[in-house]
Amino acid sequence: MEDIKSLIAGVDEVGKGCLFGPVFAAAVILSKKNEIELLNQGLKDSKKLSQRQRHNLVPLIKTNSIAWTIGQASAREIDVMGIRDATEKAMLRALEKFSSPPDLILVDGILPIRLWPGKQKTQVRGESHFASIAAASVLAKETRDELIKRLARKYNCYGLEKNKGYGTEIHRTKLIKEGATKLHRKSFISRLKKN
């Protein structure tokens, strides 16, 4: 049994730049032993993995982590509070689901979570430096993509099953032709119309 002296959670988000749907965040706590196991199984930055590789890693991350959580902030929350605050809200929601707060959080990027009361460290391209952030990036991406796939059946004219809510040319063209749904980020779309 590994002696765990402190709980360190990696935190990452996905979907910040999308026109559709919530922003998701995940937080993952790994032991050193399980970090090595997951890295040996191919864990790395979710952007460097295929969809199949990410999908296969999800159960491994869930079973090999000490704890993992998911948080999200809706398109409406993004419109009301802005993407930075909504992203932080999603991260806080994930972190607050842990039964006890981690001793340290590792946040992907340069911006700390302003309302987090505990210790934190930011790291640009954190998913390339810390296995726990890489694991969080995979969980957040796969969880959000699964939701968008389900929503694509209901909102089938926007190409969501392929673009996952990002502002591809097809998505933008359909927005002009069909209009926005209640799950589109109105603040993002209004910026598109100005350009």
Curated annotation (Swiss-Prot):
Quickly give the catalysed reaction.
Endonucleolytic cleavage to 5'-phosphomonoester
State the protein's name.
Ribonuclease HII
Q: Which UniProt keywords apply?
A: Cytoplasm, Endonuclease, Hydrolase, Manganese, Metal-binding, Nuclease
Q: Where is the RNase H type-2 domain?
A: 6-195
Query: Which EC number applies?
Result: 3.1.26.4
Q: What does this protein's record comment on cofactor binding?
A: Manganese or magnesium. Binds 1 divalent metal ion per monomer in the absence of substrate. May bind a second metal ion after substrate binding.
Q: Which GO terms describe its molecular function?
A: manganese ion binding; RNA binding; RNA-DNA hybrid ribonuclease activity
Gene Ontology biological-process annotations: DNA replication, removal of RNA primer; mismatch repair
